[in-house]
Structure formats: structure tokens, C-alpha cells
Amino acid sequence: MERIDIMRRVALVDYGKLVLQDNCGDIKALEPGTVKIDVTACSICGSDIALYRGKRSLENERYFGHEFSGVVADPGDGANGIKKGMRVASELSRACGHCWNCRNGLPNYCRSMNDALLPGGFTEETLVLNTPEYSFISPVPDTIDDITATLLEPTNCAYHVARRADVKHGDTAVVFGMGPMGLIAARIIKSMGVD
């Protein structure tokens, strides 16, 4: 199996302490079902901020940054039509795709969340799970720039909330909290014809 040599990454080494590292020793080998991506942009998620501020356990988090875009450097098995040179964006990138929860549509309860994305999105290269059954990357059209593409995962989350709210054209809805997620949810709900 090919070993990936990472040149640099931003790592959270302690609560409130980010360090630019020149060598990432914890990246695993490219294995079947894995895609290597040259990262071009990475956004900061609320979960990254919570980790930075010490509201989440560093022991349970081995990566930093999961909302990113980039170019496929090695498509691995090439599942789901992913090809070398393709522009992609990540989605929920932390689940393993193999455990009972993942196989039953509950990736947010994966017990191996940290193994699917190492060393994270704040690096020059990273690995993402992509199998015929489970993929965490989506192609990005040329009409969307790299920075905007990093919003794929939070947009999917906001869309899921809008669908679960079961609002329909002509309904009235209120979104509490106008941070990034609230703003995205408000735009999605508005596009559905909701006041």
C-alpha cells in the first residue's frame, strides 16, 4: 500500500493551541475504499471551534477540519465515478462506513468516526472514505469556487433540518440563531417558498 507523506498541516495540539506541523506521523496508508485529495480550501465548523475551546475531548478527536474542497490526487478504487484530477468537496467525513451504525444509515453514531479522515482538512493532502456503499465526497462543478465548495457539508445539514421541519410553500417559519448554519437554513427554507 502507498504511504502518503504529508508536508504540512495545522494541528490542534492542546485546547486553544494550533501548530503548523511539517510532518504528520499519524496518517494511514492509502487502502481500498480510500481517496487521496490535495486540499485547496477548508472551512471552520462549529465542532472545530468547540474542540479548540475545550468543549470536546481531544482524546476522542484525532483530526481538525472536515469541511474542505480539493482535487483528487489518487482515486483509489475509483468508486462512484471519482477520477484523478476531479474537483471534490467533503461531506460528513468522520465515519468509518463499515460498522453496524454506518451500514444502517446512522453514520453520526459511528464508533470509529476519526478513522475515515486523517489527518483532517487543514493539511495539504488528506484521505477520505469512498466505497460503492458509502462516499463522503461529491464532485464540484467549475461554476463553484473552492471556498464556496467547503460549505457543502453545512448546507447538507441545513437542508436536512429544513426537510425534517416539513415546511411547505406558503408556510411561515422562524430560524433561531443566525450564525452560518442559521443563515444557510434560512436561505434554503426561503428557496422552498416559505416566509
Residue ranges: model-predicted function:
Residues C45, G78, M181:
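Conserved Rossmann-like nucleotide-cofactor binding loop
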Residues D26-I27, E59-G65, N114-G120, V128:
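Short Gly/Pro-enriched turn/cap motifs at secondary-structure boundaries
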